[in-house]
Structures are given as structure tokens and as C-alpha cells.
């Protein structure tokens, strides 16, 4: 039984109970959202029996973030990837994808799954291509089915599979500025061009569902034709694929499998709401998992910023999970520090989306930190911040002594120009002179 089938049968699984506590929501609501397909609980039966702490992705839950790690053909090793995993989870990643494309993929993934408390996602075509010697033209559907089953047996919780790219879509990409930017999408496109046949992953969809259902692997329907520049945003190729993903969503549900859908990409700020609403309609409310989106293309080295602007907007309008972008995007393989910066940027984006959507308790931490700020409780401010070490380090750069951790000013304004200290003085004066009736707190 998958989480979806259990929910449809009216059953409440241990994973649903765990999620309900984490989300502070009624367990019956969790069950009903999973049953409807609006929520997924990525929990491969193998991983669920090990280190996994179940979580939920869906419009009724808090907005989640994913961090990508993984080696490449030219850099990184098992130790570095495990350090990235630890950093990502420590700073708040809700899921992690292992996108390794280099050597030792199996060993890296096995160790990541063994040590990860969060769901692990993969793109199976990467390892399959490595085992085919890099020649996608040599692939057949059975190669892919075997790889999906192999990774499912290892405990992978969700898989990005590019079923939506069709042969008849490819001509729609000819005039794009950046063409096909999805690695998986471009590989499938190349295979279709070489063989003049339809997408073999789409043809094998029902067989893939059988594997996903056996291990309760969640579909992450890949957007192989996502725009890779704002010039290509919201074009015919993107939306032609989206229509197919909507059909695949229903087919996946009919087969008893959990489904979420991936989205763009590079989208101007004014088009984000339309994109989210269109996806929700076309894909029947399935959780939307977006990469960014980046809202401008002119800031290599700062794309964690260009993208978290779009991500916050996407989350506010209904995206259920945000895939982080690091400062290294478009430039190179992220290191541990890049992972940290990407996760923090996206925790900010997801949190602001939760506040905007008025999710239960979302603003409590903001209010607590604001009260600590007004009370000049520096240690409490550090504790409540997303990155306490950095917050304290910045304060220590100019006022390192312990005495300044109780001072009623910082180095920005000093003791005479602090507006909050002046406000404190005004309130005290008003009390003494009884100019206004102030409530006691």
C-alpha cells in the first residue's frame, strides 16, 4: 500500500501521524489531502524503515525547500557529498536530491540514504547514462526501468522522470534563446531525434508506475522543456509539456502512486502567478515543485538571490516546494558553503511565503525576534535567526565584548541615535507625565 492508497481507504498511517505533528495540523486533514493528491509524503518503504523522518509537500502544509547535492564527472567525492548533506539538513533543507553524474554514484547514494533524515530524490537517467558509457542513443525502455527499480530498492523517496517531453514538441524549441536546458529533457530529446520515435519513458509510464507503487516512490514529473532564460518563459514548448504532465498526473493517481510536478525555471516576476495558477489547474492540484524561478538572467554569482525573489513569489501563489539555487548556478558545482547560502536564501523565501499565506504559526518566530530586538536581547535575537552564527559574528565584528550583548544599541546607531532606545525613553516620559494611557505588558 502506498500513502495514497492508504489515504483513499480512509486509513491513517504512522507517517501521516508524524507529519500531522510536524505541521501542527489535524491528522484527518493530512489523510484527506494525501487522498486527494494535493499532498505527498515521499517515504520509500526502505528509507522509512531506516533514518527517514517523514514530511509532507502540499498546499495545506508549510512551504518546503529542496537542496541539490551530488558529484560531477570532474569534481567531488563521497566525503564532500556527505558534508553537503549534513550542511543542507542542518540549515533546514526539507528534502535533498542527489544529482551525481560522475563516478561511484551507487556508493554515494547508498551512504546518503543511510544517513539522511530527509527524503532523497534522484534523476535516474543520470546513472543509467553513466552505465551506458554516455551514449543516450543506446538506451531502451528496459534500461530505464531497471535503473528505476534499482534506485527504488536502495530507498530513493522520489524520482524526477521526464515523461512529458514528446517528439512533436521539439520543433517548438527551435527559436528559443537557450534551447532545452534540462539535462534529462535534452537527453530524451536527443534519443527521440536519433530514433524518430516517441519518448520511451512516456511509453513505459504504466510499467514505471508499477515500480513506484511497489516501493511507494513519489513521482516528480520532470519539466524537460522548462525555460532556461526569461526570454523563453511561458512559451508554447513549456505549456505543451505541461499539458502532458497533467495527463500523467491523473494516470499516476489511477495507478495508486503519489505525484508532484516540477516547474520552471526562469520566469519574469509578472508571469509567476499565472504560471503557478495554470499548473495547479492543468495538473489537478498536484503539488508544484519549482526551480527558483529566476526572475532575471544578469547576475551570475548571485542567482541564489535572483531566484529566491521568484521562489518567494511562487510560494505565495501556491508552489508547495522550492528547489534551491546556489551562488554557483550556471558557473560550477556547488561546494559546502554554496549549499549553506542556497539553503538559507530559500528558507527565507519559503518562510515569507508561509507568512503571506497566513499559515498557522508562520509569523510567531518573526514576532518573537521583533520583541527580542526591541528589548535589546541580543542573545535571543541570535538564537531565533535562521543563521545564528552569522548574526552573532556580524555583531561581534564591531562590539565583541560580552558587555555589549546587553547594550541598548548596536554599532549602526550608537547609544545616542538608536530609534528603539529613543522610543523607550519617550514611553517612559509619557508614563511619568501621564500624557497618555499606555497598556502594561
Swiss-Prot record:
E.C. designation(s): 4.1.99.17
Residues given in the record as substrate binding sites: 68, 97, 126, 162, 182-184, 223-226, 262, 289
Cofactor or coenzyme needed: [4Fe-4S] cluster
Residues noted as binding Zn(2+) in the record, renumbered to the chain: 266, 330
Residue positions binding [4Fe-4S] cluster: 410, 413, 418
A family per Pfam: ThiC_Rad_SAM
InterPro entries hit by this protein: ThiC, ThiC/Bza_core_dom, ThiC/BzaA/B
A biological process term (GO) from this entry: thiamine diphosphate biosynthetic process
GO molecular function, one term: zinc ion binding
Uppermost EC category: lyase
UniProt pathway: Cofactor biosynthesis; thiamine diphosphate biosynthesis
Catalytic activity as recorded in UniProt: 5-amino-1-(5-phospho-beta-D-ribosyl)imidazole + S-adenosyl-L-methionine = 4-amino-2-methyl-5-(phosphooxymethyl)pyrimidine + CO + 5'-deoxyadenosine + formate + L-methionine + 3 H(+)
Cellular component terms (Gene Ontology): cytosol
Keywords: 4Fe-4S, Iron, Iron-sulfur, Lyase, Metal-binding, S-adenosyl-L-methionine, Thiamine biosynthesis, Zinc
Transport among keywords: no
Free-text cofactor note: Binds 1 [4Fe-4S] cluster per subunit. The cluster is coordinated with 3 cysteines and an exchangeable S-adenosyl-L-methionine.
Homology family: Belongs to the ThiC family.
Job of this protein: Catalyzes the synthesis of the hydroxymethylpyrimidine phosphate (HMP-P) moiety of thiamine from aminoimidazole ribotide (AIR) in a radical S-adenosyl-L-methionine (SAM)-dependent reaction.
Record's protein name: Phosphomethylpyrimidine synthase
Organism expressing this protein natively: Rhodopirellula baltica (strain DSM 10527 / NCIMB 13988 / SH1)
Phylogenetic lineage: Bacteria, Pseudomonadati, Planctomycetota, Planctomycetia, Pirellulales
Record gene name: thiC
